[in-house]
Amino acid sequence: MKKLQLVLFLVLVIIFGMLFFVKKDNSNNVDLSKPEVAGESILAGLKVSYLDIGQGDASLIEFPSGEQMLVDCAIDGRILEALGRVMPYYDHDIDYLLITHPDLDHYGGCTEILKRFDVKNIIYNGLEKRGDAMWEAFWQALQEENANYIEIDKEEVWQIASTTMHILYPDHSIKQNKNIPGTSSEVNANDTSIVFKLSYLDKSLLFMGDAEEPLEEYLLTTYGEQLDADVIKLGHHGSDSSSSEELLTMTSPTDSVA
């Protein structure tokens, strides 16, 4: 019995030693191998958690500096439970809240986020849905938050910590004209989504919001090979209306997330 206990003890020592060695590896080479926890992309010091909340969409980006960006808030207060699985209970700050577009399954939980967290920057595409009670409540909560409000109305490149965030769309004021440039057909809210590419070291992630094929075609024409990415967050939850063969060929991702 004592020999068995000794063997088990030695096995545990070896396992913990290996874990310690892995954690102490400070190499700058980005590793896109499958993470230990499903629903995450881990690129050295950059971590993206794709939150499992049933209906809706939400992702938490944790930058190498420790700053955090929440991309969309799902449909309701379940976002708080989902964040509780990836954030410390004592963390009441979110540096950036980015709402890609005003579909309820993307902004519905934002009012709960604004009640629970101190949000420093709010990023939005500017599309208004006056007369919609849910959107009106969301908009009122945004106005009451003491945060820096950023409305995306042009292509921009931001530096956050040591990452580059290239905002690809909207590249014009959605308030003035929500249609895709060069087209006259009316678009729904999905094709007003904020689309951005996040690059860190030699790897990149492309976030498509709810972009459907008409917006994908415009992005392909406008940006071409700039859309190439290692990981793509598929548009419109991976539905048939998005992620055309042309887009996937151009982006040539190693991994995709619906």
Language model: regions and residue ranges:
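Non-globular, low-confidence helical/coil segments that flank catalytic cores
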Residues: 2-258
